[in-house]
């Protein structure tokens, strides 16, 4: 991903997250850092999102194992509940899609193996409500 395109996608996603009530920041040095830093991290309630951000005109994008591993390693530094996320802006459909990886491995992210970012927000909201209502 071109560096400027990547920055713009990250900024757009931070704006979307903030619009949904998250505290979200972009970490501009994440790729070059030896530390396990995601492109973006966001918090809301007791949930921490560690996000690898991509943007493509293609119908798929490959995310390398070391990028996915950084998401898990970043989350392991915190005691709060964390979710690793790969967020991809598929430009041909003008839509952000997300995938929650289960382990650190090379992953090919497609429109078909992801959910919309709106669906992610619904899942997270439901999860928060269940935690509040469960004694």
Swiss-Prot record:
| GO MF annotation: an example | DNA binding
Transmembrane parts of this sequence: none
EC number assigned by the record: 3.1.21.10
**So which cofactors does this thing need?**
Mg(2+)
- Null allele phenotype: Not essential, it can be disrupted. More sensitive to DNA damaging agents hydroxyurea, cisplatin, and methyl methanesulfonate than wild-type. Double hjc-hje deletion mutants cannot be made.
The processes (GO biological process) annotated in the record are: DNA recombination; DNA repair
Q: Binding positions for Mg(2+)?
A: 10, 39, 52
A family per Pfam: Hjc
Locate the site labelled Transition state stabilizer.
54
Subunit annotation: Homodimer.
Q: Which family does it belong to?
A: Belongs to the Holliday junction resolvase Hjc family. Hje subfamily.
List other remarks.
A second Holliday junction resolving enzyme, Hjc, probably with different substrate specificity exists in this organism.
Q: What does this protein do?
A: A structure-specific endonuclease that resolves Holliday junction (HJ) intermediates during genetic recombination. Acts only on 4-way DNA junctions in a sequence non-specific manner; introduces paired nicks in opposing strands 2 bases 3' of the point of strand exchange only on continuous strands of 4-way junction DNA. Cleaves both mobile and immobile junctions. Plays a more direct role in DNA repair than Hjc. Overexpression of this protein decreases the growth rate, and leads to genomic instability, and global transcriptomic changes.
Q: What protein name does the entry list?
A: Crossover junction endodeoxyribonuclease Hje
Name the species this protein comes from: Saccharolobus islandicus (strain REY15A)
Q: Which gene encodes it?
A: hje
